[in-house]
Amino acid sequence: MYKKCHALRRIFVAGAVCAISSILLASPSQAQTSKWPDKPVRIVVPFAPGGSNDVIARRLADSLRQSLGQPFLIENKPGAGSVVGANYVAQAAKDGYTILFVSGSLATTAGVQKTPYDAKLAFEPIATVAESPFVLLLRENLGVKNLKELIAYVKANPGKVNYGTAGIGDNAQLMTELLAKEVGGLKMQSIAYKGISPAQLDLVAGRIDFLFTTMASIKGTAADALPKIAFTGATRDPGFPNVPTVKEQTGLDYVVTIWWGAFGPAGMDKKARDILNAEIKKIVQTPAFETFLETLGARPMISTPDQLGVLLATDVDRWTATAEAIGIRQK
């Protein structure tokens, strides 16, 4: 009887040791994922401090720190129109501790430049955070009151009307040329500046005729007083209910917004991704975060990872086709 009990006890102990060993020898990714995050998370912003990407990322990072109990640290890695920072994340570990926070410039850059990564495949979409329509501003005394009149004016003066951009291949150029193509082929001159601020200054001075920009860019500047004749969202901007959309004025399915979202490297740990998606959805729908976004002329935008992936791919294709059509895409 004693021998039988002793044998059973040895079997039980051996089994317990094996079970404990299995837990201890679990892969690092399994151990990390079970309690993600258990250390600080880096949020890479591929632009210099102070811009909308940086400002929104910092507010989001603070909210994530409060909800998940770990620091979310901002690292600014500017260069090549978001390529430097984006490429850094594309090559990062897939454990969920390196995240890219970026605007739709991820798509416009991929549409114009030859990037070291395939934007549609190199990243794991996590969640959208916010979006903002663009606004079409005119110089004073141009003599038109709405988009239809502007289109007619450009057609009557082929090659003589000019518009401003923040640089070759930026949002403003691509969306202006897309609109020109969709309304039947308008001939205009594109004037590229080093940033949107000098373009807006020249619009105020009357040196250029119009430009697409964001409310965040003109807030507190003289450009905010210029005529606003159209917004590019799917619906009218709540702050300017009397200004119709491009879609309303043309009948075209023309909707272009700047959006902000979070991505990881392709193949990122799915549990970490899903935790982030759920937390970001909660954060952006709080009244405090919504009020914060309003100060930037933006509004909350929630999505599933798959929806963000479709949004990115659609924009990459649209801007690639536009850049090729006007001959500015790098070979």
Where are these regions (language model features)?
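Hydrophobic alpha-helical segments typical of transmembrane helices
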Residues: 52, 56, 60, 85, ...
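An extracytoplasmic/periplasmic, membrane-proximal ligand-sensing/linker region
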Residues: 2, 38-40, 270-331
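Hinge/capping helix and adjacent helix->loop/strand transition within the periplasmic-binding protein
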Residues: 91-97, 111-198, 246-248, 259-292
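C-terminal lobe and pocket-closing loops
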Residues: 217-285, 314-317
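Short, low-complexity disordered leader/linker segments with a strong preference
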Residues: 1-38, 330-331
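N-terminal (or domain-start) structured segment
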Residues: 31-121, 160, 168, 184-212, ...
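Beta->alpha turn/N-cap motifs
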Residues: 101-106, 175, 196, 212-218, ...
